[in-house]
Amino acid sequence: MAQKGVLWNGKYYTIPQAASKIDSSALAKSPLGGANVLAVLGEMIGLIPPQTAMQVGNPSLALSLINPISEEARLASQLVFQPSPGTDTPGASQVFFLPVNPATPATLDLGTMVLASYMFGLPASQLKVKVETGTTGKKISVAFQDNSESFDNLEKDSFSILYTGTGSAATMTIDVTLANHKLTTAITGAADALNLDLNTYNTIQALVDAINATGKYTASVVTGSPNDSTMLLDAVVTQDIKTASFTAGSDLQAAVDGINSLSAYFSAARKVDAGAAPANINWTYATGGSNGATTNDDWQAAFDVLKTMQVDLILLISDDPSIHSMGDAHCTFMSGPTGKSERRQFVGGALQNWNNPASRAASIVSLKAAAANLNSDLTMHAGLGCYQYDPNGKPKLYPAYITAAMYAGIAAGSSPVMPLTRKTLRCLGLETNLQVTETSDLIDSGIAPPFPDTVQGAGYVVSRQVTTWNQDSDLYHIEFSVGRGADYLAAQVRKRHEQIAGQPGTEGMDATIVNLTNGVLQDALTAGYIRSYDPKQTQLRVDGTIRYVDYSAAPILPINWIFSTYHLLPTTATIQL
């Protein structure tokens, strides 16, 4: 039969009438996402495992995680959170630290259990351990430099058992090896022997119930945790259970659990087939802690970790140009159609020689070559090193990647469109005070050096936020905040569009796509991320299963130059006497 009605809004109409629906998609609020997650990559030892990104929210926690031997990493960790003096320019608040060097922990074999330090690197080998008889059970003490910890009463009773049958003698054996894992008894003069598989009776309560079910034994749960695993019992060999009740324990597991739950320095693991608490030993040092020798493969592994994360900014604690190029390649991939996670990086090179005119000229050439080698709008090169206080409170000159840490901190504490130009840096001085011609030359070449703040007459600021891009004069590529702001807005629109993928391609859904796009633009306008936009310019074109959306907005550009002209007016006067 021919269809005589129409389908609209999910309902089929045959009777002429008016109908209505509400489209509120233009009013939908989907707040703009964050854009200030910073990842810091470099050689560092301490409590962060290698090739593991750990989120840190404040500078104090960063200091507690990074060992003092990693001086530059610790300094960078402070500068990203506090890159500028005063409160006008806040620092980062979401920072991931990712050690690239293959550092190893220190370990200590206690015979039946192995301790592994939480600390990675050579200092971990300064940890020492003592095992002795405690008030009850074992006492394990740990010392590191001037700090120590002790854990007493490491023992655990699990269940008691007494043979009550007619046999003249009875013994019990608990075999904890992986091959057997059984509780067995040997009875003289009666057929009351037990042969219980601990894989079957895998809790203390289940084991006690199975023993009591024979009617030939009296067993009781002693532990406060009846669901404790029987696989963690201590070994027992031909123990008399006829003349007196015997209490089986889990003392080894008590020692393991005690270390794992209480120690700030070690984790513990029982060894395969071990079945007794560790023997007493005098103070013994752990061994094997190493800082590791970092290779480019280690750096690549760290960048691969970042591929699984949503980060926006990257700081590389390295002066190696090959590492800078690897980081830029990572940013390029992740900012592309496959990565779909836009990000940019900050780098700095080694200290240069500025002692004489020839050396200065060579240093300028070297910095210009570094920018030319990168030639990327995703990398900002700080150029010059800076003076900071060292751990002893004395001024020390550090490489340019420490200056880059301040750049990264300022960016991570600001909106995506905030220019870094003329932002004040927290430093005592610079590697050199560039001449005006040198500064201009470096900026033209794609280096963003700091220079003295001539406006305030003190301190140091970012000269101009140029990237290392040298291919054209497009501000999207040249000015860090312009490119970052545009990338941010495009990512926010894309994320809203992702919500529509898989929906039916109705005209109403097409209107929703347009409304969502304009909603993001309006939110960006309200937040000051764009200067203006025209919602009527947002266009959608349908091609089968494809939706092409075109939209436009005026980006926020930095104010780089203000040229003023003072027009002098002639003085005229009429004097009457």
Where are the regions that the model predicts?
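A glycine- and small-residue-enriched flexible loop/hinge signal that marks low-structured segments
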Residues: 2-18, 22, 32-120, 124-178, ...
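Short acidic low-complexity segments
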Residues: 28-29
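Short, contiguous acidic and Ser/Thr-rich linear segments
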Residues: 193-199
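Serine/threonine-rich, repeat-prone extracellular segments and beta-strand-based repeat modules
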Residues: 535-541
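C-terminal edge-of-domain segments
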Residues: 541-577
